[in-house]
Structure formats: structure tokens, C-alpha cells
From Swiss-Prot:
L-aspartate binds at T122, N126, D127. Pathway: Amino-acid biosynthesis; L-arginine biosynthesis; L-arginine from L-ornithine and carbamoyl phosphate: step 2/3. It comes from the Bacteria. This is Argininosuccinate synthase. It comes from Polynucleobacter asymbioticus (strain DSM 18221 / CIP 109841 / QLW-P1DMWA-1). It is found in: Cytoplasm. Pfam families: Arginosuc_syn_C (PF20979), Arginosuc_synth (PF00764). GO terms for biological process: argininosuccinate metabolic process; L-arginine biosynthetic process; urea cycle. Belongs to the argininosuccinate synthase family. Type 1 subfamily. Its EC number is 6.3.4.5.
């Protein structure tokens, strides 16, 4: 790919992507465009602009974009309409951010006339797959540079040596060994990987967690909140309307102080290995519980069961980087159709790491108290009808048992 003229780099301004920027300049000799996404990671992003300028990047080739609203509105909320969980635990905070970054990189490539894109994902992880499947889905002819699959800088020490050799500033934390974890954050979650977490038998240190208090140290009194949903998406907390990204940030704040959303798991990566990660997803944990609560009274039984059947497949598509694939888009159409009547208010109790639904109400409720009551229903439900229903559903099992007995007599 030596004929590359211009490349758009997903650039955080940190050590890894700063080394990549210099390496791209030296290895490919091409013009570089940097793109830094604000997904609510809580970091000051303007230093990335200053660092890019130090590398000689033209001011017009430096993009720092606030994507928080688009991220939550067009990616997080659609995913939560499906009650998406990967392997029974993971709420996909990293996975769902990658398709948006890839989308914006391709948009910038078109805007600037770039013929290539580049990312800082390693050759061992899922992110390389997520980024590149997105690139190719949105721009089939794009060229992709994945430095971690090309260079020999395969350790933190080699990265630092390269940085010092080329005058790339190395923060003191890296010189002293840095944070013991590889972290990734956005409005949905913060993740921790690496170092002693690579031993699945080692307990995560309490000092690692950044967004949530220890459940043991959370308030001794529970907090009750209300979340209003409209067409499957949350729109208000305690009667106050929020924009999507503001609502998720507020749920993170509320959940964090009650120790909600901590997770320590071993997951199966798409590339084949098992990986241990720790996550904090306070707002997402509350949102998932609330959404299932409002669906419990607004969704038809078979529709709800169908959604539950399809959800693991939908989750795997997102985890594996197939957000832009036709099968994910088809599933999204179905999921969104099911959400038309998912409107109403859910009340939840937050207490020392737990979140519980305590009430739910909707103008579209399918819960009929007159039928469900244990008291006299005035003939709304004829209990005698249940006998025939049971016999018909037992018919196939009765036939099977009768046939088994006949075989045993031969």
C-alpha cells in the first residue's frame, strides 16, 4: 500500500496513537488527517489538537467532533430496544462505539479526499475487526492501515523507546509504568483490561473502579427514580425531559453513587481467545432493567419471547463488528417495530449495587387486572376453559408416552 496519498487516523492523542501518527508519516510518507471523537469519555480533547499540530498536521486536517448525542441516540438506544446483552452479562459498551467512529472516519475521508484510514487496535483484539468491517461496509474501496499488524513495536517498552527516539512526549505515568490497566470509556461504560486482570483468579482491586462507589459504601437509604419511555427509548427521569446523551449521563451519575453496574467477566472474543475484562455501566444497567419493566406490560407475550430468542444473535452481531451488516439492519427493523407501543413510566429502587423495578404504568398496557385478579372477575375469565386448553397441549405428550409403552410390550 505504498501508493497511499492521505490517511485518516483515529487519534486519541495518547502514547499509542501518537506513535502511530509518527510511524505513518515515516513508513508511508503520506499526508495525515487526525480524527478525535468525543463520546463522553470525560477527557479534555483539545490537547489532541495541540499534539497533532506538533507533528506538522495541517489545522484543516485536524477533526475533533462531539458525537455524544449521535452515539446515544443512534447507537446506544437502538441497541437497548433489544435488551442486548452479550453472553448473559456484557452490555457492549466498547462494541457499540466502534461503528460510529468508523462511520465518521469514512465521512472525513470523503470530505478530505483521503484514500486510506488507520486505527490503533491491536492484532489480538476485537476492535480491529469492528473498525475494519465498518470501513469496508461503508466504503468498499477504502485502504486500511493497521500498524499493530505491521510493525515490531509489540511492547510498552518498545513504544516508549520509539517515542523518546522521535521526540514524542511521554507522560510521567507511562515512564513510571502507567495505569496498571488498559482503559476505554464512553458515555455507556468504562472498561479495564490487562496487567493482573489477565489472571482470572486474581480479584480486581477496589482502587481500580472509577465511576461507582463500592456497594458496601453506597448510601444506606434506597433512592426511588422514575424513567419515562416513548417508543422504547427513555425520554425523562423523574418527570424531567433530557436529550439522549444527557439522560444517560444522569443515569450514570445516579447509578454510580449507589454502586450499580460493576461487572467482572471472562468473554469469548471473536478472534478466538478468552479475555477477562472489568466494566462499569451504571446508567446502562438501570436502563436495561427499566426497559424490560415497561416491556413487561406493553409487549405481546409471543413478541416478547421472539425478541428474547433473537437477542443473543443481535448481541453477537454487534460484538463481532457487524453493525452495518444487512442481517443486523433487518433485525433492527423488526425490533423497532415492536417498540411502537412501549410507552409509559417505570419506578425503580436503587440500593447498594442493586436496581429493582417496583412499579410500571402505561396507557398501552396489556395487563388486565379484571382478568388477572384472584377475586371474582365477574365472568371475564371462564376457568373451566382451561381444561380443554390443557388437554390439547398435553396431546402430543400423551401420544408419545402411549407409543413408548406399546414398544416396551413388544
Amino acid at each position: 500500500m505504498s501508493d497511499i496519498k492521505k490517511a485518516v487516523l483515529a487519534y486519541s492523542g495518547g502514547l499509542d496513537t501518537s506513535v502511530i501518527l509518527k510511524w505513518l508519516q515515516d513508513t508511508y510518507g503520506c499526508e495525515i488527517v487526525t480524527f478525535t471523537a468525543d463520546l463522553g469519555q470525560g477527557e479534555e480533547l483539545e490537547p489532541a489538537r495541540a499534539k497533532a499540530l506538533q507533528f506538522g498536521i495541517k489545522p484543516e486536517n485536524i477533526f475533533i467532533d462531539d458525537l455524544r448525542e449521535e452515539f446515544v441516540r443512534d447507537f446506544v438506544f437502538p441497541m437497548f430496544r433489544a435488551n442486548t446483552i452479550y453472553e448473559g452479562e456484557y452490555l457492549l459498551g466498547t462494541s457499540i462505539a466502534r461503528p460510529l467512529i468508523a462511520k465518521r472516519q469514512i465521512e472525513i475521508a470523503r470530505l478530505t479526499g483521503a484514500d486510506a484510514v488507520s486505527h490503533g487496535a491491536t492484532g489480538k483484539g476485537n476492535d480491529q475487526v469492528r473498525f475494519e468491517l465498518g470501513y469496508y461496509a461503508l466504503e468498499p474501496g477504502i485502504k486500511v492501515i493497521a500498524p499493530w499488524r505491521e510493525w515490531d513495536l509489540l511492547s510498552r517498552e518498545k513504544l516508549m523507546a520509539y517515542a523518546e527516539k522521535h521526540g514524542i512526549p511521554v507522560e510521567m505515568k507511562h515512564k513510571q509504568g502507567g495505569s496498571p490497566y488498559s482503559m476505554d470509556a464512553n458515555l455507556l461504560h468504562i472498561s479495564y483490561e490487562g496487567r493482573h486482570l489477565e489472571n482470572p483468579n486474581a480479584e480486581a482491586e477496589e482502587s481500580m473502579w472509577r465511576w461507582t462507589v463500592s456497594p458496601e459504601k453506597a448510601p444506606d437509604a434506597p433512592e426511588i427514580i422514575e424513567i419515562e419511555f416513548r417508543a422504547g427509548d427513555p425520554v425523562a427521569i423523574d418527570g424531567k425531559a433530557y436529550k439522549p446523551h444527557e439522560l444517560l449521563a444522569e443515569l450514570n451519575r445516579i447509578g454510580g453513587k449507589h454502586g450499580i453496574g460493576r461487572l467482572d467477566l471472562v468473554e469469548n472474543r471473536f478472534v478466538g481467545m478468552k479475555s477477562r475484562g472489568c466494566y462499569e455501566t451504571p446508567g446502562g444497567t438501570i436502563l436495561l432493567k427499566a426497559h424490560r419493566g415497561i416491556e413487561s406490560i406493553t409487549l405481546d407475550r409471543e413478541v416478547a419471547h421472539l425478541k428474547d430468542d433473537l437477542m443473543p444473535r443481535y448481541a453477537s452481531l454487534i460484538y463481532n463488528g457487524l453493525w452495518w451488516a444487512p442481517e443486523r439492519l433487518a433485525l433492527q427493523t423488526l425490533i423497532d417495530h415492536t417498540q411502537q407501543a412501549v410507552n409509559g413510566v417505570v419506578r425503580l429502587k436503587l440500593y447498594k449495587g442493586s436496581v429493582s423495578v417496583i412499579s410500571r404504568d402505561s396507557a398501552n398496557t396489556l395487563f388486565d387486572q379484571n382478568i388477572a385478579t384472584f377475586d371474582d372477575d365477574g365472568g371475564a375469565y371462564n376457568q373451566a376453559d382451561a381444561g380443554g386448553f390443557i388437554k390439547l397441549n398435553a396431546l402430543r405428550m400423551r401420544i408419545a408416552e402411549t407409543a413408548k409403552r406399546k414398544r416396551a410390550q413388544k
